[in-house]
Swiss-Prot record:
GO cellular component: a single term: nucleus
Protein name listed in UniProt: Homeobox protein SMOX-3
Subcellular localization(s) per the UniProt record: Nucleus
Alphabetical list of InterPro entries matching this protein: HD (IPR001356), Homeobox_CS (IPR017970), Homeodomain-like_sf (IPR009057), Paired_Homeobox_TFs (IPR050649)
Top-level taxon in the UniProt lineage: Eukaryota
Main location: nucleus
Gene that encodes it: SMOX-3
A molecular function GO annotation: RNA polymerase II transcription regulatory region sequence-specific DNA binding
Originating organism: Schistosoma mansoni (Blood fluke)
Family: Belongs to the paired homeobox family.
Keywords: DNA-binding, Homeobox, Nucleus
Length: 288
């Protein structure tokens, strides 16, 4: 059998306008949307479905053409000035943020017709040239600022940042390193620092002696007997005399004084806690 030749459908401008408007809303309309659209533009649902298939294929083709341009566009976080883009009511639903991730985004292109895309491309090209000009001007300004800060300026000028003494000092420091072709890691070029490990150890020893007192002071870490209240009182009296002497002594660290007072308070609390009626009763019996 001979195949029946398919008649090519021709669309009017009104039909194409309605179809494009529906395509901007969604690329994949459901059966109800297609039937409603077919009734409005006097077409069959099958013709509308075929048109959407062809339109999606055309959109993918244009997307592949535009895709390489995204790699060449410089990334910029500066938003696009809306005054540079020609006002168009169909562009109101497009969110323009930056050329690297929004203008060539397929989701945003779905809501823009082909004619509007050409206008967008022209606007983006103009924006890219403006962006390059701005970066060039900022680089020139930075270079000028660096030149003003460099120490090779004449020190006689009123805008000189470094004085003669500072330049002389820097030359004296850098001079030995320029003369030697090879830097040797020895004491000749790297003299021992003020805070060497040995000096740090010595400092730590002196600090240790300044914090920890001599053996003449009472060691409160040794626990006293619970029932020996006389020894506790003697220790308290001795500690009070010791604290008065330590206040006069400037070598005692303040933190050590604080720990001593805390220990005294702890011993007082421990002595008071153990001085229960039962302990006093046993003490009276032992005294008799």
């Amino acid at each position: 059998k001979r195949k029946q030749r398919r008649i090519r459908t021709t669309f009017t401008s009104l039909q194409l306008k309605e179809l494009e408007r529906a395509f901007q809303e969604t690329h994949y309309p459901d059966i109800y949307t297609r039937e409603d659209l077919a009734l409005r533009i006097d077409l069959t649902e099958a013709r509308v479905q075929v048109w959407f298939q062809n339109r999606r294929a055309k959109f993918r083709k244009t997307e592949r053409v535009i895709q390489p341009d995204t790699t060449t566009t410089p990334s910029s976080s500066i938003p696009i000035n809306m005054n540079n883009i020609e006002h168009n009511p169909s562009l109101t639903n497009v969110q323009l943020t930056s050329p690297d991730n929004s203008i060539y985004n397929p989701k945003l292109l779905s809501s823009v017709s082909l004619d509007d895309q050409d206008k967008l491309h022209k606007a983006i090209d103009a924006y890219n040239t403006m962006d390059k000009y701005e970066t060039n001007t900022t680089n020139d300004l930075l270079n000028r600022m660096k030149e003003t800060d460099l120490p090779h300026q004449s020190s006689t000028s009123p805008l000189s940042y470094h004085s003669k003494d500072e330049l002389k000092y820097s030359k004296e420091i850098i001079g030995p390193f320029k003369k030697t072709g090879q830097m040797k890691f020895s004491n000749e070029f790297y003299p021992p620092l003020k805070d060497s490990p040995f000096s740090v150890m010595q400092k730590s020893d002196t600090l240790h002696h300044s914090i920890i007192p001599s053996k003449s002071y009472i060691d409160w870490s040794n626990p006293c007997r619970q029932g020996d209240n006389d020894s506790i009182n003697n220790n308290i009296m001795n500690s009070t005399t010791i604290t008065t002497t330590t206040n006069n002594n400037s070598n005692i660290h303040p933190l050590y004084k604080l720990t001593q007072t805390c220990r005294q308070v702890n011993r007082l609390l421990v002595g008071g806690a153990h001085d229960t009626p039962l302990n006093t009763f046993h003490k009276k019996i032992s005294d008799k």
